[in-house]
Amino acid sequence: MSGSTGERSFADIITSIRYWVIHSITIPSLFIAGWLFVSTGLAYDVFGSPRPNEYFTESRQGIPLITGRFDSLEQLDEFSRSF
């Protein structure tokens, strides 16, 4: 229901031709832009996350797991040197 400010009702907006002309262009454009952002790898560069082939390198194939309770700092130093 419209108020006294002169705004259009939601049903009036979504049934107008102008709404669908604008949104039939913008919604697919946003989808394509997002797909290109991810598929080109730009999302990895922008957010700094490793690519799927960079999680495990040739020199480091194991999971960096801390096993010792009292020598955890030494294990962390060893893991950070392997990066």
Curated annotation (Swiss-Prot):
The chain crosses the membrane at residues 21-35. Keywords: Chloroplast, Electron transport, Heme, Iron, Membrane, Metal-binding, Photosynthesis, Photosystem II, Plastid, Thylakoid, Transmembrane, Transmembrane helix, Transport. It is a single-pass membrane protein. Heme binds at H23. One of its GO terms (cellular component) is chloroplast thylakoid membrane. One of its GO terms (molecular function) is iron ion binding. Its cofactor is heme b. The keyword Thylakoid applies. It comes from the Eukaryota. The keyword Membrane applies. InterPro entries: PSII_cyt_b559_asu (IPR006217), PSII_cyt_b559_asu_sf (IPR037025), PSII_cyt_b559_CS (IPR006216), PSII_cyt_b559_N (IPR013081), PSII_cytb559_asu_lum (IPR013082). This b-type cytochrome is tightly associated with the reaction center of photosystem II (PSII). PSII is a light-driven water:plastoquinone oxidoreductase that uses light energy to abstract electrons from H(2)O, generating O(2) and a proton gradient subsequently used for ATP formation. It consists of a core antenna complex that captures photons, and an electron transfer chain that converts photonic excitation into a charge separation. Heterodimer of an alpha subunit and a beta subunit. PSII is composed of 1 copy each of membrane proteins PsbA, PsbB, PsbC, PsbD, PsbE, PsbF, PsbH, PsbI, PsbJ, PsbK, PsbL, PsbM, PsbT, PsbX, PsbY, PsbZ, Psb30/Ycf12, at least 3 peripheral proteins of the oxygen-evolving complex and a large number of cofactors. It forms dimeric complexes. Belongs to the PsbE/PsbF family. This is Cytochrome b559 subunit alpha. It comes from Spinacia oleracea (Spinach).
